């Protein structure tokens, strides 16, 4: 499922301001950029960025409302959606994200500033690698799906899907927001 984020220009400005602070940590004497390695081979904020930045919390609440409206409209059995974690990624030239999954009910990626970077968002059908024949004319299997997105696009997908990002080929910073959501059930269900 995908949609265009309402108020994209507002959110883009808010997120870019956070990244500006992160990029100038010596001046501001504040940074949440982490040192430990993960699948994101770029700069990112911590997984709990909704607790650290009011703008990220507001954005997250707006996104959850859109997801809840979609779930209600489509009649999915998901009475309560909770944020598990969210963070910002910014990719400089040659930065990328290795294929991975999150093991949650829903994952979201909000593409804030991605156009003209040459980087592609990819879904993989599985975690297997395949061998290809050396001959010129050989059969190819399609285990990878490239998703073309524009600035302002939000993708919502099963958190178990393997996905990744190819390297940023430009000098322009590629910026995304990512979140993992879980379904929760009330203690007492009203109906089945």
Predicted regions and their residues:
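Ligand-binding loop in jelly-roll beta-barrel domains
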Residues: 162-176
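A short coil-to-beta-strand element that immediately follows conserved catalytic motifs
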Residues: 75-86
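A generic structural micro-feature
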Residues: 80, 100-104, 169-173
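Non-heme Fe(II)/2-oxoglutarate
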Residues: 1-75, 96
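Hydrophobic residues positioned within well-ordered beta-strands of beta-sheet architectures
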Residues: 1, 84-86, 106-108, 175-179
């Amino acid at each position: 499922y995908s949609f265009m984020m309402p108020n994209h220009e507002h959110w883009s400005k808010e997120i870019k301001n956070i990244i500006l602070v992160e990029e100038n940590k010596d001046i501001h004497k504040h940074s949440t950029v982490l040192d430990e390695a993960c699948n994101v081979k770029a700069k990112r904020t911590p997984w709990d960025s909704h607790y650290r930045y009011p703008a990220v919390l507001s954005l997250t609440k707006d996104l959850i409302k859109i997801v809840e409206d979609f779930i209600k409209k489509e009649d999915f059995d998901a009475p309560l959606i909770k944020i598990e974690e969210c963070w910002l990624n910014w990719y400089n030239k040659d930065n990328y994200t290795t294929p991975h999954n999150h093991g949650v009910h829903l994952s979201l990626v909000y593409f804030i500033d991605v156009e003209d970077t040459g980087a592609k968002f990819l879904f993989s059908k599985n975690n297997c690698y395949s061998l290809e024949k050396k001959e010129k004319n050989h059969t190819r299997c399609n285990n990878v799906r490239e998703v073309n997105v524009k600035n302002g696009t939000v993708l919502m997908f099963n958190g178990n899907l393997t996905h990744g990002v190819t390297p940023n080929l430009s000098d322009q910073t590629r910026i995304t927001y990512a979140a993992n959501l879980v379904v929760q059930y009330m203690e007492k269900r009203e109906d089945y």
